[in-house]
Amino acid sequence: MIKRLLSGLILMVAVNSQARQLQEPPTQIVYRFDDHRYLELKGWDCEGELWFTDTKRGIHSQVWSQFYRIFTKRFVHPSERYIAISAWGGGFTVSKDYGRTWSGAHYSPGENEPDGMNLPPYDDIISFTVVNDQGFLQTKHSLYMSSKPFDDPRLAAGGPGITYTLDDGDVYHIDPRSPGPAWGLDYITKRALKNDIAKYHTNYQNLPDKTPEVKNYTGWDHMRCDMDAGR
């Protein structure tokens, strides 16, 4: 009798699993920036493809091709040209053209954290704010920032580059052919910036000490996802 029940349960699970594979994965809105921009997740159990839509500009683009899981911390994003999306567990995908194209962004190498690590544990993250084309990731111990939204013109093709002198008098030069990360593609703390040559770039100078205040934001302040969607 028990064997029959177990066989029946196994068969039922197999049938349900096969039926779900044949069924189109559910799509749900997991974040709204405002009245015309939003993120959709396509997949079962809140994991799958992530898509961005801007109805005003006619943009519909894929941000993550698979395995995306929502960022669960506070998320405020009024910025339009520069869009930065994080995920559960960390990491960034960013767009610098209103969401038409996407590329990866990273934590800068160096001692961003008090313990010498270059990135925070996910549980230490408090919030992620993207405003005025710049991202600010607040953690328990640090504020990670992307650069100001432009590249140092001295490092453009054909530019003079940047010559700088260290405290010991040694002189170095940053060549335009090896300029380092383009704007918006790495996140760094002031702690790490002290020992990084990026501090000589104009787009890394005079960075704020705290996340700028965001007023009159009409979007969501957290991502949302229904685990039972499609069932």
Which residues does each PLM region occupy?
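Hydrophobic h-region of N-terminal signal peptides that target proteins for export
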Residues: 7-18
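Short beta-strand elements that form the blades of beta-propeller/WD-repeat-like
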Residues: 35-43, 79-90, 120-145, 173, ...
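Repeated scaffold domains used in trafficking and secretory/extracellular systems
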Residues: 24-29, 67-78, 110-128
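Conserved Ser/Thr-centered positions that define the repeating blades of beta-propeller domains
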Residues: 53, 93-96, 140, 144-152, ...
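Sequence/structural signature of beta-propeller modules
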Residues: 18-27, 153-231
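Asp-box/BNR beta-propeller loop motif
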Residues: 53-59, 93-106
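Beta-strand-rich domains and repeat architectures in extracellular enzymes and scaffolds
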Residues: 22-51
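Beta-propeller fold detector
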Residues: 61-65, 103-109, 175
